[in-house]
């Protein structure tokens, strides 16, 4: 080597790996949040709400007199500043939902990972609950899960308003088993949405043989100021979730459209917020007080896994 030549310095860069490890650690320490678009009952609203920031939607399901799921329809009254009468035939909605949650489809939304079916079983007799669950399972199996052949991938929550209708869960579960697809129950969770006493809800799950995959809702229509209802029951649900012997895995609060109420809900540690304005919730998630503690849930987040305060 001539004296005039110099060796080029060699640098070892570890930053990408360190950065990835840091990202994983930070992600693990942040509570995953489901922004739940409320009352998504027309096919076109799937795109609308996801584009506004929702990673989850809630859809109303009405039943006919024979306990067949018939329409995605809410009807009047509903939340203030919303049109209550948008609807679709249930099976047609399921097909649109399948396209929106199947990778590779032209209508696919990677962000849409959870669907809450608000089951309007109030029109049914208590002894029809099992049949409603059975027929709901058959419809989902055919039109959403595509009979187990590359169907929609979203997680599903069956939200039931009446504790007396716990046999809907039994009918749903037993039908998937009979039809040869018990593995799909891994994608299914539960919610009793009637704002009942937490202990009474626990008893209904016991009757239904449910020991996991539980979301607990709490809330009131946006037509009533949130401070009138308050967050007392939601706090009890969070306390149950965080206890060593609680039955709740996730807690969501509804219907939240205001920035102040969103912050209050995040402050007590909810996992999901149902809203008519997903962009409001997304904006709060990005505020400096919250972006270090919370993040938008993705498909990699198990919605049946408990994240305690």
Curated annotation (Swiss-Prot):
EC number(s) recorded for this UniProt protein: 4.6.1.-
Domain of life: Eukaryota
Reaction equations catalysed: an N-(acyl)-sphingosylphosphocholine = an N-(acyl)-sphingosyl-1,3-cyclic phosphate + choline; N-hexanoyl-sphing-4-enine-1-phosphocholine = N-(hexanoyl)-sphing-4-enine-1,3-cyclic phosphate + choline; N-(dodecanoyl)-sphing-4-enine-1-phosphocholine = N-dodecanoyl-sphing-4-enine-1,3-cyclic phosphate + choline; a 1-acyl-sn-glycero-3-phosphocholine = a 1-acyl-sn-glycero-2,3-cyclic phosphate + choline
Propeptide: 2-27
Obligatory cofactor(s): Mg(2+)
InterPro entries assigned to the protein according to its UniProt record, in alphabetical order: PLC-like_Pdiesterase_TIM-brl
Any Gene Ontology CC annotation: extracellular region
Keyword Glycoprotein: yes
Signal peptide interval: 1
Record's protein name: Dermonecrotic toxin LarSicTox-alphaIB2bi
